[in-house]
Amino acid sequence: MAFVDQAEIEVKAGKGGDGIVSFRHEKFVAMGGPFGGDGGHGGSIIFKVDEGLRTLMDFRYNRHFKAQPGGNGGTKGMTGASAEDRYIKVPQGTTVKDVETGEVLGDLLENGQELVVVKGGRGGRGNIHFATPANPAPELSENGEPGQVRKLKLELKVLADVGLVGFPSAGKSTLLSVVSNAKPKVAAYHFTTLSPNIGMVRLDDARDFVMADLPGLIEGASQGVGLGFQFLRHVERTRVVLHLVDMSGIEGNDPYTQYRKILDELGQYDETILNRPHIVVPTKMDMPDSEENLVKFRQEVAADSGLPVQPEIMPISALTREGVQPLMRLTADLLATAPVPESYRPVVEKVSNDKTYDFKPEQHNFTVEWSEETEEWVIGGAEIEKLFLMTNIQRDATIMRFGRQLRHMGVDDALRKAGAKDGDDVRINNSDFVFEFSD
């Protein structure tokens, strides 16, 4: 039994550090020249598979992830410190998609496998890189490149670790609703659950697992009666079984008789299920006759020589929550050492190569639009916006360099073709400039 766990998050890589303008000022060193260092690289965000994780629950509480920026350059040609990459643990079998494009960035299938999902910006260059014979003392530097930003959709096809079995109305749906994020329909009548409800259980110690409330079993299920085969196939793929038994004795039902009927059906379908780690969970201990019925039930189970092993018995009341947390902790302990059944197959297929995602540079695409509201030309485009952010607009020399870069990209020609005239206002990334066409 598999279901798809999903989460949408935003990841933002670190900006590169800024290069600086600096000059060598030392005694006896005339005309020392430029000495400004480069900025350090920003941190990337990298997903890494941790086979100990079972769900995407962590991403429901934390949807925004940022890496640190690189350090700015220093004097004497010193390069700023590069930021450390940020590693985020994901479960085995996670598929990563770009929300905006729908592109699959990668499938993370092997323990320890890594995938760079956003790449940190490179550091801006200091003025030491811009010296030429014509300009031996440039006041030019670059700001750091912005880090990449992406909205990602994570998908994980999950198999239930723990299966809740028992007769209809044994309290399976109620227990699941108490310990997990699932919201099954719960009512006081038989056959409440006709298809599996699945929830993710998270303990205080950060352990988590997937629990399934399986369709109520009836006598004859191993021969296909009712939901028989469908139910038993679900049980077959769980690693730990919690066998819920109603202790209330309502409608004259005998707890031990019901317990034995479930075991018989499981054994007739597949005897190996009986050897799987399991806990017997007497339920509805808040009811008037439950304590008395539990004493009798324990005696009958202890005297049953036909059981493969004497089971752990942990009574609970889902209504009052009594015994629920100890039960969940013991369940997690069993899962830590439970063998993986043969039927517990991986449910993802590898659709892309194991590789770091190849980030392709942006094309020279930009837009030129006239804004009636502000009466100015608006220039847009990812590459232009990146160039602007890497331009130190506090220095005239770098602004002039930015103008030359735009001209080289064809922005001047596009403005002139669109009808721009000398003196028109031009807005780029919320900053205003005056258009002057150069031949």
From Swiss-Prot:
Binding site for Mg(2+): S173, T193
The keyword Ribosomal protein is assigned to this record: no
Location(s), subcellular: Cytoplasm
Main location: cytoplasm
Annotated InterPro entries: G_OBG, GTP-bd, GTP-bd_Obg/CgtA, GTP-bd_prot_GTP1/OBG_C_sf, GTP1-OBG_CS, GTP1_OBG_dom, GTP1_OBG_dom_sf, OBG_GTPase
One GO BP: ribosome biogenesis
Domain Obg stretches: 1-159
Described purpose of this protein according to its UniProt entry: An essential GTPase which binds GTP, GDP and possibly (p)ppGpp with moderate affinity, with high nucleotide exchange rates and a fairly low GTP hydrolysis rate. Plays a role in control of the cell cycle, stress response, ribosome biogenesis and in those bacteria that undergo differentiation, in morphogenesis control.
Subunit (UniProt): Monomer.
UniProt name for this protein: GTPase Obg
Organism listed in the record: Leuconostoc citreum (strain KM20)
